[in-house]
Amino acid sequence: MTKEEALKTYYGYDVFRGGQEAVIDALLSGRDALAIMPTGAGKSVCYQIPALLLSGITLVVSPLVSLMRDQVTQLVQMGIPAAFLNSSLTFRQYLLALDRARAGRYKIIYVAPERLETEGFQAFVREADISLVAVDEAHCISQWGQDFRPSYLNIPAFVESLPHRPPVGAFTATATPDVKADIHRLLDLQDPLELTTGFDRENLYFEVQQPADKRAALLELVNIQDILERVNV
């Protein structure tokens, strides 16, 4: 299967969006990558398609339990074998997931950064064929970032401990120059492809209104907010 066939088969698209193909090509060639792309630009495709084409397992380091669950649910619905390993699993569920991973049942495994240091997971990766490590929300490694997670600092040592160093892809929608430099340095990226796409979101805009009845406008805004909260937007 080619990357284009994977895009069409699993995602239903005929062409890649801006920046995706370059990152995919870099990771497939064994090169590290640092991609700064806005939310909704398709960052996940940049590591999910290589995961489908590479022979082994792709590990996706993610800081958010809810995001892992949503991503895995979506992948399974698409027919892509995936799982997550985080604190929401019971110990029995965790062991079962590792057993299935050892049996080659998954192509993509989402994992919390804290899990990388556990003895059971370390034993698993020593036996497994890890083809790619994708670091989602990579800005969490930087103390300059608003979501600093100390556990992200252990990712480079984890990667180096693998029997064979796989390519590492770092992905974020939030990166000032200082944060970008930290991601590169602290993740120990090796000659990475660095790509930053535009941040223009056509569906977002600013509007200044001057309502004649400010009280009515405020009540309308409160009602809209209440509706959004009810539907979890």
Predicted features by range, described:
Residues 1-38:
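Conserved pre-motif I regulatory segment
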Residues 206-233:
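Conserved interdomain hinge at the start of the Helicase C-terminal
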Residues 41, 89-132, 140-146:
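Conserved helix/coil segment N-terminal to the catalytic DExD/H
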Residues 58-68, 225-233:
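Conserved strand-helix element at the start of the C-terminal RecA-like helicase core
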Residues 69-92, 96-103, 182-187:
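Conserved helix-turn-beta segment of the N-terminal RecA-like "Helicase ATP-binding" lobe
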Residues 30-49, 60-62, 171:
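Walker A/P-loop
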Residues 126-127, 131-196, 215:
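Post-DEXD/H (motif II) to motif III coupling segment of the RecA-like Helicase ATP-binding lobe
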Residues 29-35, 56-57, 105-107, 166-167, ...:
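Pre-Walker A (Motif I) flank of P-loop NTPase domains
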